[in-house]
Amino acid sequence: MVRIVRSIGVCILSLAAGATFPARADQQDSAGGDDQQSSQPQVVVTGHSLQEKNAELDAARDRNLLPKLGATDYSIDQQDLQTLPQGKNTPLDKVVLQIPGVSYDSAISNPDFHVRNEYANVQYRINGIQLPDGVSALGPVLGTDFVGSMSLLDGTLPAQYGLRTAGVLDITTKSQFDQGGTLDIYGGSWSTVSPSVEYGGSGGASQYFLSGRYLQSEQGLESATPTANPIHDDTSQERFFGYGSTFLDDADRLTYMTGAWVGRFQIPNVLGEQPLGDYGPDTLSSADINENEKDRFFFALVALQTHRDDLDTQLSVFTRYASINFMPDPYYDLAFNDVAANVVRKSLLNGLQFDAAWRWSDAHTLRAGFVTTIEHTQVQDLATVLPVAPDGVVLPTPLTVNDYTQKTGWIAGVYGQDEWRLRPNLTLNTGVRFDQLNQFVSANQVSPRIVLVYDPVADTTLHAGISRYFTPPMQAQATPSDLALFQNTTQQPAIPLDDPVRPERATYVDLGLEQKLLAALTAGADVYYKHGTDMLDDGTFGNAAVLSQFNYALGYSKGAELKLNYQHDGLRIYGNYAHEITKAKDVISNQYLIGDPVELAYLASNYTYASDAQTNTASAGASYRWQETFASFDGIYGSGLRAGFANLQHSPDYTQCNAAVGRYFHPWPSGDKPLTLRLSAVNLFDRIYVLRAATGVGEFAPQYGPRRGIFGEITQQF
């Protein structure tokens, strides 16, 4: 299989590099460079001309290879990122909370946000290249340091977006690479210290950008207690990103990226828990438990983009390694939980992606492509448990059980679509994709997509679409467990059922409107309905802070979103609201995870809320810049995640507000390298709220939102 993929890639690379098409006299596309001849001498450019050429190919890629065509699109540019209260120190998963339909969850849920109440079914793309998901680490593996702009696409997606379909986080890297960079020091509450550095430049036909960040804090995860100072919650993290591009000639650009993230976390302790009494003395304190986790994520990719006449292509090869290691407290975990499980998950993935767009005529743009990945996973649950005698007595003589599984699986998808401009203000985009999955189960699906985009009058856009989706489980999270190994131990499951996890299949309908009310004021509304079979969900079952997946037989989601945005000169004000309901019934895979036979029986015959569902969510913010001074404020609201037996209850609603004030200074003679000072507050009003009550389906422990934190930042350009 690997040889086949390699051979296909070489052939396509050769064809893409050498493809030429005659220019048509009637071509009206405004893409820069479309009127250039198919054969050009090698170009070596520097300075602004290189930046302009890169910007031209970036625009061609985004316009021709990555159209949004009826998907609900929420964009955040560099200015938006800088005006957030924490600026570029805002974690990526906190940035998206300011988008309608995105709700807050704990880091253990990874990512700690949900798009339209779905589990972690989010696809990440960097410059159009799909970044494969990992094994659900406890922190955001991507930062915002390298982000030039980003968009969240959801709803009815065009056919090139497959597999992870709740949302597509489409990131475009920074593109202004003057010789220079920034030094940044950020820190404050909970002994937080986070220095970072960026540097970018160019030479000849190449440009590059590097960024690195270190973080240490005494609040790494959501605290298990409502106290101002979390107990056993330290973290240290390192993150690196590197980007480069080189023009091979005037129409061919080679791009290369690499990134790394390593995170170490203490697992927060719950106060007041009592030992079970089967092992060790009953005088132990749960505040002294010492559980830890170490996560790693590394990726690298190379992409060749061509932009010739009526044809655009991009071929990319990528690799990704991810691992998590949950390390228990061998003594205390046995005393409090009757099990101490060392859980290791490793995943090595290699892949190939190709996208092409051909402007066949003024009315039709044809697009096609494929993606294939090969993944090898290793999952080990090295559990120390206590034996149980035939009469039910737990024996205080620990034994070790090694539940180990490895698997090499693959996924392949191919798509084709036609963007048909029926009239200048009416576009019909039709497409179809085919996906084949071969992991712990084998399955495939043909998924048609159709969407209509209509501009009835100036400043008004309507879209309506319907799509079929095919979502495979994450191989590392869907690994089966050998339940027989745990017979007659304290880990023997109460439900001896472990049917394999299947891919989700769904039909998605989305309708939306965007209206420019005034020159500086826009509003939008969107409604959607999704119905699926084998609906995927996940949770943290047992006593290790790792996610496992399972299926509901049936599920549906429906909702409505509203947004309002005002931007004029230095003032920006926005507000978002979403009302959403997501329900499912009948757990049909990994049933043993549920733990309670009564709860499983109830779920078999009743629709219940999905664990990640919140009925009402909202976000709002404002920022203002006056000369060299700026201030910003934002906030989120949630009606509460699910709780209780079969998720029939929910946690209390909550709000969190953040604010910042800052100023630009020009202490150096040149005046063009400002020094920036910023003072920010997280949870400004110190609201105490619980995210997870540890009583719903697949909940690990109580998780509270952060208490008020005060932070300072100094940034110097150089």
Question: What are the residue ranges of the model-derived segments?
Answer:
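Extracytoplasmic beta-strand/coil segments of soluble accessory domains associated
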Residues: 73, 84-88, 93-131, 148
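Short acidic/polar hinge/loop motifs at secondary-structure boundaries
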Residues: 114, 129-155
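Short strand-turn segments of transmembrane beta-barrel domains in outer membranes
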Residues: 140, 148-157, 168-202, 210-212, ...
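Transmembrane beta-barrel wall of Gram-negative outer-membrane proteins
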Residues: 189-216, 227-268, 292-312, 360-366, ...
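Conserved C-terminal beta-signal and adjacent last beta-strands/turns
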Residues: 200, 245-247, 607-718
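Surface-exposed extracellular loop regions of Gram-negative outer-membrane beta-barrel proteins
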Residues: 270-278, 383, 440, 454, ...
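Membrane-embedded beta-barrel scaffold of Gram-negative outer-membrane proteins
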Residues: 312-328, 455, 462, 477, ...
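Gram-negative outer-membrane beta-barrel transporters
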Residues: 421-423, 523-531, 548-644, 715
